[in-house]
Structures are given as C-alpha cells and as structure tokens.
Curated annotation (Swiss-Prot):
Key words, A-Z: Calcium, Glycosidase, Hydrolase, Metal-binding
Reactions mediated catalytically: a pyrimidine ribonucleoside + H2O = a pyrimidine nucleobase + D-ribose
Entry EC number(s): 3.2.2.8
Gene Ontology molecular function, alphabetical: calcium ion binding; purine nucleosidase activity; ribosylpyrimidine nucleosidase activity
Residue positions binding Ca(2+): 11, 16, 124, 240
Keyword Ligase recorded: no
Task performed by this protein: Hydrolyzes cytidine or uridine to ribose and cytosine or uracil, respectively. Has a clear preference for cytidine over uridine. Strictly specific for ribonucleosides.
Gene this protein is translated from: rihB
Cofactor(s) for this UniProt protein: Ca(2+)
Domain of life according to the entry: Bacteria
Name of the protein in question: Pyrimidine-specific ribonucleoside hydrolase RihB
List of residues binding substrate: 227, 239
A matching Pfam family: IU_nuc_hydro
C-alpha cells in the first residue's frame, strides 16, 4: 500500500482532533507534520489544543504554529460550536508537549521545496497558512501533489446562509488557493453533514475504548449539544475527518468535477464557494467536490483508527 505523505493544517477544534487521530494512526497515511492556524478559536488556543491532543494520543509528529490572523478580514471565531477553549469537553493532563520554533508557513515551504512533489496538503481550517505559503514562495505550487481540504459548500453555508465557516474566516486566502492551479479536492458541508456523529456512534467508539475512544467520547458528546442547539442536528458532523477518509480510500466518497470560485466581494455572499455544478460557465473544472460518502464504511474506518491506539503490551 502506498503511504500518502501529508501535512495536516488544522485549527483544533473538535472535528480537527478526530482528523489528527486518524491521520496519525492509519497505515495508509504518512503524517509528516501538523501546522496550526487560527480559526475555531484564536491561534494561542488552537495551538494548545493541538498539542494536548498529540500529548494524550502520543502522536509524535512535529507541530508548528502558523498565521494568527486572516489575510485581510477582521478575525472571527466559532466559539458557539467549539466553546471558549476551542476544544471544550475533554480534560487534559498538564501540557508538557511543545511546538517547534519554526513558523508553520516556513515549514510548509521548506518541506515542499525539498520534496519530490509527492506531498499532499490537507487544510481543514481557514486557508491562511496555505495561501501565505503560496504567495511567499510560488515555486511550491508544482511541488504540491494535491490539496484535500475541508471547507465551503455547493449548497447552504453554516456561518452565513451563503458561506461555510472555514472559507468565511478567510475568503481572500481561499481565493488564493482556489486560483492556484493545484489539484483540489473539496469536502464541503453538503458531504460532511452526512457524517453526523449520533449517540450510537459515540457509544460504539466508547466500547472500543483506549485513549482515542475516551477522547472521541469527550469531544463528540460536547458537540452533540452545540450542534443540536445551533443547527438542530442529531449530533456533530466530523467534517475534517472526511478528508482523511478520502485519502485512505477515495472510493468511499463520490466526487464531481466542478469549477469553483470563492466570492470575495463584500455582501451577503462574501465567502461563498460558488460551484458550477451544471457547467453553465463553460470554465474548466478546478476542483473535485465531495457529493456523497459511504457512512458505514466511514465509521468503520474511524473505529479502526480508534482501535489502533489501544496498547497491546
């Protein structure tokens, strides 16, 4: 089996933590590094959350802090969903794990430039780190094998009627990425909302147990409350984890090639991913857009990763 080399760019974040857990354990993924961006909460908080998850699950991968602000817009956070810490719910041991001193953007540039073009970027938060890296060193563009991102929607948004949070948090950065010419795969809300983590899924992971089962339970029981409160959902979708699922086995997720453009005009559609589903613009497709996911397969994959953290000795 070919291991996909990835850099996971995230803003933990409840579903980010599930993506980290899966990426670090599945044998099909070679997780080179974790870069952190501001998003669900401010950078100081998302960094601590990322380090806490790595410490609890003994994920021995370097962690790099990145952009603390969006490129242009005023910063927003998703504390309504993720709480004051950005990862409310779990209680962690005192933190001893530390981030690397190198800036995430420099790490992304240096790693890509030294590569053979075989590294996939997996940004599951606002695209600030990726866009700044692209602007600082355009020579990375042909070095990126693929970008598999969580963000956007071809239907309704979740932070405004038009926009999904990750894109709305930094639309200008998203515009840079979507016009980069790099092969893109977009897991938008239309797909990720199919992965609602209901109480029976939580119970299934609790039965598996181990440190990842415990963390999964603490994380997803918190989002049960907030997702029902704000969106009327029967549980929290594990949005970001769908990107890892796609990388492990793209056959589990149906995609459609579309031309996607990010609206950066101020107004009610600011931050919208405009997806030309019918091809009416006649522009060449630049994105594989996730349409449907085999949820039985997906939860089986999550369980497999949770089970991987149980120590046998």
């Amino acid at each position: 089996m070919e291991k996909r080399k990835i850099i996971l760019d995230c803003e933990p974040g409840h579903d980010d933590a599930i993506a980290m857990m899966m990426a670090a354990k599945h044998p099909a993924i070679d997780l080179l590094g974790i870069t952190i961006v501001a998003g669900n909460q401010t950078l100081d908080k998302t960094l601590i959350n990322g380090l806490n998850v790595c410490q609890k699950l003994e994920i021995n991968v370097p962690v790099y802090a990145g952009m603390p602000q969006p490129i242009m817009r005023k910063q927003i956070v998703a504390d309504n969903i993720h709480g004051e810490t950005g990862l409310d719910g779990p209680v962690f041991e005192p933190l001893t794990r530390q981030a690397e001193s190198t800036h995430a953007v420099k790490y992304i540039i240096d790693t890509l430039m030294a590569s053979d073009g075989d590294i996939t970027l997996v940004p599951v938060g606002p695209l600030s780190n990726i866009a700044v890296a692209m602007r600082m060193q355009p020579a990375i563009l042909p070095k990126i094998r693929e970008i598999v991102l969580m963000g956007g929607a071809y239907g309704t948004g979740n932070f405004t009627p038009s926009a999904e949070f990750n894109i709305f948090a930094d639309p200008e950065a998203a515009r840079v990425v979507f016009t980069s010419g790099v092969p893109l795969v977009m897991m938008g809300l239309d797909l990720t909302n199919q992965t609602v983590c209901t109480p029976d899924v939580i119970a299934r992971m609790e039965r598996v147990g181990g440190p990842a089962g415990e963390l999964f339970s603490d994380i997803m029981n918190f989002t049960l409350k907030t997702q029902f409160e704000y969106y009327g959902l029967a549980g929290g979708p594990v949005h970001d984890a769908t990107c890892i699922g796609y990388l492990i086995n793209p056959d589990g997720i149906k995609t459609q090639d579309m031309y996607v453009e990010v609206d950066v005009n101020s107004g009610p559609c600011y931050g919208r991913t405009v997806c030309d589903e019918l091809g009416v613009l006649g522009k060449p497709a630049n994105t594989k857009v996730g349409i449907t996911i085999d949820t039985d397969w997906f939860w089986g994959l999550v369980e497999e990763c949770v089970r991987g953290y149980i120590k046998t000795h």
